[in-house]
C-alpha cells in the first residue's frame, strides 16, 4: 500500500494534470479527424465533413497553445508534457496533410517536404539531446513562424469551400506552399546548427 500511494502521488500529477490532459485530447482528436472522412455516414455531405474536420483541427490547435500556457501559468511543466506536446503537434499536422493529399487538395511534394522535415528534425533533436547538445537545435522563430503558417493553411484546406468571396482552397494552397518553403529553410538551418556534432559522430565511426 505505501508503494501504491507513492506511485499514485508520482504519476497522477505528471500524467493527468490539466495541461497534459489537453495534450491527450489533442492526440485523441487525430483519429476523430480521420473518421470524419473515412467512416461512411450518408447523412453527411462533403460540406458537413469539411466543416466538422475544420472545427476539430482548430480546437486541437487551440489546445496546442493552451496546454503550454497553462503549464507555465500553473507551474505544472513536466517531462511527460514536454515530450507529448511536440509529438501531438506533429501527429496532428502529418495526419491532416495525409488526409488532404488523399482528398486531392495538396500535392505530394508539399506533404513529403513537411512530413519528412518533421520526422528528420524530431529524430535530430532526440539524438542531440542524447549527447547533451539539444540547445543547438532548440525551436527558434523560424520554426514558430512555420508552425503558425501551417496552422492557418490546414483549416482553410480542410474547409475547402469558399466563404463569401474568400476562396479557402486558393489561399490555403498558397499558404501551405509558403509553409513548405519555410519548412525546408528551417530544416536546413537546424541541420547546419547540428553539423559539427553530425560530422564529429561520423568521424568517430
Task: State what each model feature region is.
Residues 4-205:
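Alpha-helical transmembrane bundles and membrane-interface segments of multipass inner-membrane proteins
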Amino acid at each position: 500500500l505505501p508503494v501504491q500511494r507513492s506511485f499514485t502521488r508520482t504519476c497522477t500529477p505528471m500524467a493527468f494534470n490539466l495541461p497534459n490532459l489537453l495534450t491527450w485530447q489533442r492526440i485523441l482528436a487525430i483519429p476523430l479527424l480521420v473518421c470524419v472522412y473515412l467512416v461512411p455516414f450518408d447523412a453527411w455531405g462533403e460540406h458537413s465533413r469539411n466543416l466538422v474536420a475544420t472545427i476539430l483541427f482548430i480546437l486541437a490547435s487551440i489546445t496546442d497553445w493552451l496546454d503550454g500556457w497553462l503549464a507555465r501559468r500553473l507551474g505544472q511543466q513536466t517531462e511527460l508534457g514536454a515530450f507529448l506536446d511536440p509529438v501531438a503537434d506533429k501527429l496532428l499536422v502529418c495526419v491532416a496533410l495525409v488526409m488532404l493529399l488523399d482528398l486531392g487538395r495538396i500535392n505530394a511534394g508539399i506533404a513529403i517536404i513537411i512530413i519528412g522535415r518533421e520526422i528528420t528534425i524530431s529524430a535530430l533533436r532526440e539524438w542531440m539531446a542524447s549527447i547533451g547538445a539539444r540547445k543547438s537545435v532548440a525551436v527558434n522563430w523560424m520554426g514558430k513562424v512555420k508552425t503558425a503558417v501551417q496552422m492557418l493553411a490546414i483549416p482553410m484546406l480542410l474547409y475547402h469551400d469558399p466563404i463569401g468571396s474568400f476562396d479557402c482552397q486558393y489561399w490555403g494552397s498558397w499558404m501551405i506552399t509558403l509553409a513548405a518553403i519555410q519548412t525546408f529553410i528551417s530544416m536546413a538551418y537546424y541541420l547546419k546548427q547540428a553539423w559539427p556534432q553530425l560530422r564529429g559522430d561520423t568521424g568517430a565511426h
